[in-house]
Amino acid sequence: SGINEKSKIINNLNNIDNIQFKFIQKTNENIEKGRCILAFPSKLKCSYEDKNEKELIVNKNMMAITQKRYGKTLFYPLSKSTFINILGKNELIKIINESSTIIDNYVNIIFIDKNNIKTLIKFDKKKFLLAGWTSFDQYNNKITFEIEITSVNQMINNNVFTLPRKG
């Protein structure tokens, strides 16, 4: 089941270099909104619409989360993030091929990683584009990330993915 949908999603992914999208992130009762640019492989910049002016940048194997209001940045290895499976196009295609599918309002790819952590990766049924994901963090908090793609394959200045300096 879902073989036809999977092949359409993969065909789409193969033709995408970058996407820009609006997002709503829900962690338990906490709701955050903002905009992101995702460039394959493994580059992501998200600007949150919050009072702390939170910004998240992923570049290759590092993730930096900055609260511009306080001038504070925390650095994390990307391997600790649920983003890791979505940022690499080849990894994402492999997951789509190997995972089971549930089709409801979305094409849902059910991915279970080596630590037995389940992530539901959602694609819309009309355009077969990424629509979001649901995962659980190490504290078993449910994190839902809903996205609305605003552009595909636009020219992007790679400087936007420059990590802040440490220290």
Kindly give the residue locations of the regions a language model identified.
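Gly/Pro-enriched, hydrophobic low-complexity segments
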Residues: 91-167
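Extreme N-terminal tail/first-helix region
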Residues: 1-15
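A short, Trp-centered hydrophobic/proline-enriched beta-strand micro-motif
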Residues: 11-31
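Low-complexity, acidic/polar, glycine-enriched regions of mature
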Residues: 9, 17-20, 69, 79
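Short hydrophobic/aromatic-rich beta-strand segments that constitute the beta-sheet cores
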Residues: 21-23, 44-48, 63-66, 109, ...
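An acidic-aromatic
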Residues: 36-85, 143
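Solvent-exposed strand-loop boundary residues in beta-sheet-rich modules
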Residues: 27-29, 69-71, 139
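Flexible, surface-exposed loop/linker segments and immediately adjacent secondary-structure boundaries
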Residues: 69-107
